[in-house]
Amino acid sequence: MNIEQEREKLILFTKIGAIVLTSFALLATSFFVYPENRAVFNESLLHEKELPIYCVEKDKPQISISFDAAWGNDDTASLLATLKKHKVKATFFMTGGWIEKYPDDVKAIAAAGHDLGNHSENHKQMSQLSAEQCKEELLKPHEKVKALTGKEMILFRPPYGDYNDNLIRVCREINYYPIQ
């Protein structure tokens, strides 16, 4: 190879390198200029794992208060009074057994304007159930609350925080938002 060919090869290599570096720089810059693009690249997409809702972006800082109603109702009346006193709304995630034992509390929670959430029929490890069993665990308390209050529940918090892809798909299939 003569010097002219070496020079042309070096110029070509430099041009290709400049194009590659510029492309990477533009891509990296887009993550800072358009931060909403970062949400597209999350672990669930890389691993194709279904995830429940952990947080929601809002214009101003807010928190969400929720209670699991599964074992007793000793504190329900005082909770409702405290929430009313401070003009705060909350979500009550109820199991089917709790709904059956305390129907007046379910009605009081609904009448006070709080969100009614589903916490399954029997408080089972949902990741151990088939799709059909998951659906049954969700639909039974749903129907009980609807019969008592006329309200449709759309939020589901899995017992023990236990979920898998199967459960999340079932939730979405029956128009529930899985919450963690």
What are these regions (language model features)?
Residues D68, L83, F92, L116-H119, ...:
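Conserved, mostly hydrophobic/aromatic
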Residues P35-R38, M94-T95, M126-A131:
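Acidic/histidine-rich helix-loop elements
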Residues P61, H86-T91, A111-D115, K151-I154, ...:
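Loop/turn elements at helix/coil->beta-strand transitions in domains of secreted/extracellular proteins
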Residues M1-S66, W71-K85, K101-D104:
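N-terminal pre-catalytic segment of deacetylase/amide-hydrolase enzymes
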Residues S78, K124-Q180:
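Catalytic domains of cell-wall/extracellular-matrix polysaccharide-remodeling enzymes
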Residues A70-N73, G97-E100, L116, N122-Q125, ...:
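Solvent-exposed loop/turn segments at secondary-structure junctions
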Residues L79-K87, I99-H119, C171-E173:
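Acidic (Asp/Glu)-rich catalytic clusters
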Residues F31-Y34, D59-K60, D115-S120, P178-Q180:
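Short, basic/glycine-rich phosphate-binding loops at helix/coil junctions
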